[in-house]
């Protein structure tokens, strides 16, 4: 026990405790104090109130879009290879693109040519000659699943960028299952703007308009009738399916006021790839209409007056300030790979959150008070030392959560309460071991030394096992499970510190001052 008499060790342990207390203070202050690090615990949805959105990724739309792209690539490849075809069909139910060769003798050549098409993932599709003579490109089930996983992961990142752009504080965005995303928005009781932002795919393309007036009624293959975003501007336009410039090549977008009209507009700029493509199409199609299509609706279709080579442009579509800002935000964040739909929405009022906070603090306070009384009644002075260690444990837990600006939820508060129980177990084990050594007739110093040594290995083993288990919960869990696991994991670390260092040091310093003939246990 003499090694714990060191003033340096005493100062180190007390310094950690004082630092923890300092980090806790901002949680009880409304305004920053210059000499105190200003980091606070953020309250989760169940404590602060706010909105909960459960959104589903439309994976069928994702597959359909890929089939449409595959059909377009098939058409272009056959034309370039001078291979005739009839009726390219897309069957989303069977995940196939099929066509009838113009000449049955060219079927094998068709298969060999189309088999060289680029694949997004390995073995994405196979090219087969059917019994009826048609050629079919079939998406594989594994490729569809891989694309779905990638789409959900990509959607989460884009959702996060869009929400961050609105200034929302502490949003929580997690995956649920194979095709769902949970969005928690603390402090936002009316998430209508967020829903509108997330419900828009924001897939922008730039395509030429077919100038043949007959095609406005009967569009040929490769041309689609695309409705106007503003129906007052006219009926659907015949737009070529071929995408001349893709919105993924955008590098920036912002809401501006048009200097000529005084109306709100969205300015944009392309990267080098988009700049070259935009320059090429505007140079070779002067006098033609160029449609800006957002989510399969034409925002506007201006006539190309002169080549645009600078890689910058502007979209005007009768926007107000909010719509222009939101569109620019969505373009900066990127297009969603597939549409999102809200399948569940809940709102938690701030009064309910305040009730949860009061209930959580009350449970922690009552639990801590009962522990204090129990330890003092059963272990006397050493019980008081255990209570001091428990208080320091709670302070250090709050300090670490504040340092990392973690989000505290009701399950997290339950984890803190459970941690106090685990810390009590450790202190009880130490005191019982000391009692056993006293009963065997050992001197006070020997009883304390041996009692701690016998208890330490058990405490470390049990806490190490619990630590690993809760780390796994944090890594693989979601939502409330992660909050619970986080506080338990932090609590285990602080429990080992306060139990094996602080409480032992308090006992050792007391013994060094008093040299008692017997121990108060």
UniProtKB/Swiss-Prot annotation:
Domain of life of the organism encoding this protein: Bacteria
Signal peptide: none
SUPFAM superfamilies xrefs: Multidrug efflux transporter AcrB transmembrane domain
A GO cellular component entry from the record: plasma membrane
GO aspect biological process, one term: intracellular protein transmembrane transport
Membrane topology recorded in Swiss-Prot or TrEMBL: Multi-pass membrane protein
Cellular location(s): Cell inner membrane
Annotated coiled-coil segments of the chain: none
The UniProt record lists the keyword Transmembrane: yes
A GO molecular-function annotation: protein-transporting ATPase activity
Keywords in alphabetical order: Cell inner membrane, Cell membrane, Membrane, Protein transport, Translocation, Transmembrane, Transmembrane helix, Transport
One Pfam family from the record: SecDF_P1_head
InterPro entries noted in UniProt: SecD, SecD/SecF_arch_bac, SecD_1st, SecD_SecF_C, SecD_SecF_C_bact, SecDF_P1_head
Sequence intervals crossing the membrane: 8-28, 359-379, 388-408, 410-430, 459-479, 483-503
Annotated family: Belongs to the SecD/SecF family. SecD subfamily.
Subunit structure: Forms a complex with SecF. Part of the essential Sec protein translocation apparatus which comprises SecA, SecYEG and auxiliary proteins SecDF-YajC and YidC.
HAMAP family: SecD_B
Task of the protein: Part of the Sec protein translocase complex. Interacts with the SecYEG preprotein conducting channel. SecDF uses the proton motive force (PMF) to complete protein translocation after the ATP-dependent function of SecA.
Protein name per UniProt: Protein translocase subunit SecD
